[in-house]
Amino acid sequence: MKISAVAFDFGGVMTTSTMPQRVIALAKEKGIDWNVFVNGFNAHRLDYDAGHITLGEMYALIWGDAGFSVSDETTAAFMKADDESWCYRNERTLEWMKALKERGFKIGILTNMAPKFAREHFRSRFADFIALADAMVISGDEGMVKPQREIYDLLRSRINLPAEELCFIDDVEKNVNGSRAAGWNAIRFATNDQVEADFEKFIL
């Protein structure tokens, strides 16, 4: 199979966290039921990632849905913990991206990410990842999110390759399925060892 480019998700692939770990710890500390919290988180996160609402507005919606009365101070603590949770770099992924680049593969980045986080954290803390990319799409800059078909088509157009020559790496099944629906190849990320081994089998 001819693969010419590998596109990477951010959270859970370029980072070591798959959910905001500091938020989980803070919810426990504040006595907020995690199951109730996560329902609201999942309901409103994509609107935040698309740039339609701010992080503060997202948390206000979470509290409102759950009927929680939460102080501004506690909300600010959750917002800080949320941002910090996504800043744990996966250095193994960085080294793999470098190795793929050296082998002649184009590199893409396709992520659901709010504009503010991209400006204040991603572009500085992950600058060496970004430097490897031949094309990048950040959902909040475009007003669309994975798994919408249009966001995959946008990265494909920017990297200027046919869909069948692209391989997408993401830890979320619905996003992997979305890329396949757009005609891409895809591998769901679980661990670095797994995804690297699966990729080598994939390109045989």
Feature locations, PLM:
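Active-site neighborhood of HAD-like aspartate-dependent phosphohydrolases
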Residues: M1-G40, G64-D65, A181-A182
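Short acidic capping loops at alpha-helix termini that bridge into adjacent secondary structure
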Residues: W34-V36, A131-A135, P162-L166
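Metal-dependent phosphoesterase signature
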Residues: Y48-L94
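Generic structural signal for small/hydrophobic residues in well-ordered secondary structure
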Residues: D9-G12, G51, L100, I109, ...
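Acidic, Mg2+-coordinating phosphoryl-transfer loop and its flanking beta/alpha structural elements
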Residues: A163-E200
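Short, acidic loop-to-helix structural element flanking the phosphoryl-transfer center
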Residues: A5, A77-G108, R149
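Conserved Lys-Pro-Asp/Glu-containing loop-to-beta segment of HAD-superfamily phosphomonoesterases
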Residues: V145-E173
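Substrate-recognition/cap helix-loop segment adjacent to the acidic, metal-dependent catalytic center
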Residues: T93-G140
